[in-house]
Structure formats: C-alpha cells, structure tokens
Amino acid sequence: MADQRIGADVSDFARAHMERFLSGDLPPAHIAMGIRPDLWVRSVSRGHLLAVWPNDGSRNIGSGRVFGGWVAGLSDNIVSLCMASALEEGEGFTTQDLQIKLFRPVDGPEIEIEAWLKNRSRTTGYVEADWRLPNGKLAAKVFAWKAIRPMEALTRST
C-alpha cells in the first residue's frame, strides 16, 4: 500500500526510495544513530519535507540543550530525504557541503524540521531546512549542497 505521506508529485523512482525509508527499511548507520524517518516524517512532496522530531531529552548534552552533532546528523538525513524526493530515474546524490547554524538551544518536546529544495540543476541540488521550537522560534538553519550523479557513479565497484 502506498505511503499516504508521499505526495503525488514525487516521481515513481523517488517514491520507491522514499517508501523504503518510511517503511523502516533503514541503513545500519540510521539504526545505530537512532535516526527514524519512518516515525518522524509527516509529509513529503517533490522538493519539500516536513518532520516532527519527538525530543525526549536523550540527545541532550546539558539541561535543555540538544547535542549539536545530533542536530547535524539528523539534518543531513532530513535534507537528503528532501533531495531524494526530487530525483529522476537512475539518479543518485551525495552531500558536498552541509552547514548548520544554531541560533538558540534546541529544546522542547516536539521540534518541527522543514526542508525545501531551493535549486536543482542537472548536477547540483541546494536544500535548506529550518528547525523550529514548539513556540515557533527558529532554533537552527541548515544549508546543504548535493552532488547529483548517475546512480552507478555512486556505487562502489568491487
């Protein structure tokens, strides 16, 4: 059954990729880090993603402060899923540059993370994301550049 969180404007190729992730079929690194797009993504359309991360305090480094490395790791996943929503048949990508700007401590029970594909050329995607606190204030801004390549160029040959 099709995942209702994925919009009709997502290509069949991208939809298959998104459905795998949103079903919980995750790479080992996601499992080890506790990154769960299958539980947190609320909606995906071509070039847009909305997630709500349930902050239970387990990623805090101090009272009311989420570890910046966690923000970066989850951000890379969010902007990558957003980029994946705009792929066409046979395309893949890898992160070229990821920048995180923290404006205030990330705290609160539910953090909204929204990502947008701002520009896509044949070889590069540029994605931005906002982390918003429960009060609506901007906690972090994410900037990511993705190198778009044929899938076979990104697969390791043995």
Predicted segments — roles?
Residues 1-158:
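Terminal targeting signals and extreme-terminal segments of soluble enzymes
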